[in-house]
């Protein structure tokens, strides 16, 4: 079906009192992303011409957190109901576009459901998203005559008979811009709450003989709102369960789907295995046959084929070629790069450093601002001293170098191909190819030495 141009209004002005937080409710995160950002992303994916964000409390924090050029910020200085919120945005509506109304605290609404609602909207009428609940207490009820939607009655204003209705309003609707502006202008606050309800436009449309079509979401979780942290945690588990199910069906082996968190997007090859309590953040790519041990965090990184990441390793903004092994307890910070077959062992940290093909840093090492060649051995306790308190400097190590344990490389420094650095050496000058560098304090020995004894 050919759709009209469309703009989206997202209501995000609520205080979120029940969150007991200084952060605006809609900025609390689900799957690593602010709830309202999920809704903004859905609006953009639908092709919204404009996204009008109605805000009130915490406006400065919202503007700091949400960097989207497509956002039009609309202030609702007083919170006088959903209808009042829409009235603030109405001056921005074009007559010939459709207006879709969404909520910043309903984060799991799907693009597929919204597109079905958009397609179902009748010409000159309203598309309304509704669901049926076993216990609809507290929700606005959908009233019908001969099967046709005639209005929405809020729970506090409903009669005992109307409260028996199980079909409820989700608050999500779509209508033409000109119609929306006209109906909004007619709203009154003659109700138990003394507020302007957006739901009253349904009765106004019905009185004009306009058709109102109700559409149901694919899943109830799509229209569940968040008012407290318990509800947010439940939606988090719903979302994570759905993501885990998709990955399992796509061939990823999750050892325990209930103990896996995806906080971004995961692209993967075949026969990937992920153990328990692994967190994937941002954009992550895993090649074929990648294995990730328990407790790992992988963020914005590319992991090549046949890599193995041992437990409790953190990888952020890093790039691993094929057949690399990392961990346990390793940390790859932004700019870390491992070439094919490289190994980083336990308690090794890398930042802005490249480790060449087949090179190894087995344990207890810091490699920062370093370029390390192929087939290099980095001994335990090696440190690249890259910072003088004001500036960073680079360490370059050629191919086939052997670096002994407890070595300090004071940058800027270059170690030539095939060189050997003796254990305990502090390297302050360049080392030539195939040379041995050694710097040690002469060892002295005192025979018959007795340790001091504490006086009682």
UniProtKB/Swiss-Prot annotation:
List residues binding acetyl-CoA: 380, 386-387, 405, 423, 440
The entry's stated outcome for residue 307 to A is: 1350-fold decrease in acetyltransferase activity
Organism, as annotated: Escherichia coli (strain K12)
Function of the molecule? Catalyzes the last two sequential reactions in the de novo biosynthetic pathway for UDP-N-acetylglucosamine (UDP-GlcNAc). The C-terminal domain catalyzes the transfer of acetyl group from acetyl coenzyme A to glucosamine-1-phosphate (GlcN-1-P) to produce N-acetylglucosamine-1-phosphate (GlcNAc-1-P), which is converted into UDP-GlcNAc by the transfer of uridine 5-monophosphate (from uridine 5-triphosphate), a reaction catalyzed by the N-terminal domain.
Output the superkingdom of the source species: Bacteria
Instruction: List where in the cell it is found.
Output: Cytoplasm
The coenzyme or cofactor needed here is: Mg(2+); Co(2+)
Its main subcellular localisation, reduced to a broad class, is: cytoplasm
Q: Which reaction does it catalyse?
A: alpha-D-glucosamine 1-phosphate + acetyl-CoA = N-acetyl-alpha-D-glucosamine 1-phosphate + CoA + H(+); N-acetyl-alpha-D-glucosamine 1-phosphate + UTP + H(+) = UDP-N-acetyl-alpha-D-glucosamine + diphosphate
> How is this protein's activity kept under control?
Inhibited by its reaction product N-acetylglucosamine-1-phosphate and by UDP-N-acetylmuramic acid, which is one of the first precursors specific for the peptidoglycan pathway.
Record Gene3D superfamilies: Hexapeptide repeat proteins, Spore Coat Polysaccharide Biosynthesis Protein SpsA, Chain A
List the keywords (alphabetical). Answer: Acyltransferase, Cell shape, Cell wall biogenesis/degradation, Cobalt, Cytoplasm, Magnesium, Metal-binding, Multifunctional enzyme, Nucleotidyltransferase, Peptidoglycan synthesis, Repeat, Transferase
For this chain, the family text in UniProt reads:
In the N-terminal section; belongs to the N-acetylglucosamine-1-phosphate uridyltransferase family.
List, alphabetically, the PANTHER family matched.
BIFUNCTIONAL PROTEIN GLMU (PTHR43584:SF3), NUCLEOTIDYL TRANSFERASE (PTHR43584)
* Binding site residues for UDP-N-acetyl-alpha-D-glucosamine: 11-14, 25, 76, 81-82, 103-105, 140, 154, 169, 227, 333, 351, 366, 377
* Gene of this entry: glmU
Q: What is this protein called?
A: Bifunctional protein GlmU
Stretch list, region N-acetyltransferase: 251-456
- Relay the cofactor remark from the entry: Binds 1 Mg(2+) ion per subunit. Can also use Co(2+) ion to a lesser extent.
Gene Ontology molecular function: glucosamine-1-phosphate N-acetyltransferase activity; identical protein binding; magnesium ion binding; UDP-N-acetylglucosamine diphosphorylase activity
Q: Which CDD domains match?
A: GT2_GlmU_N_bac, LbH_GlmU_C
Listed pathway(s): Nucleotide-sugar biosynthesis; UDP-N-acetyl-alpha-D-glucosamine biosynthesis; N-acetyl-alpha-D-glucosamine 1-phosphate from alpha-D-glucosamine 6-phosphate (route II): step 2/2; Nucleotide-sugar biosynthesis; UDP-N-acetyl-alpha-D-glucosamine biosynthesis; UDP-N-acetyl-alpha-D-glucosamine from N-acetyl-alpha-D-glucosamine 1-phosphate: step 1/1; Bacterial outer membrane biogenesis; LPS lipid A biosynthesis
Which segments carry the region annotation Pyrophosphorylase? Answer: 1-229
EC number in record: 2.7.7.23, 2.3.1.157
Q: Which residues cross the membrane?
A: none
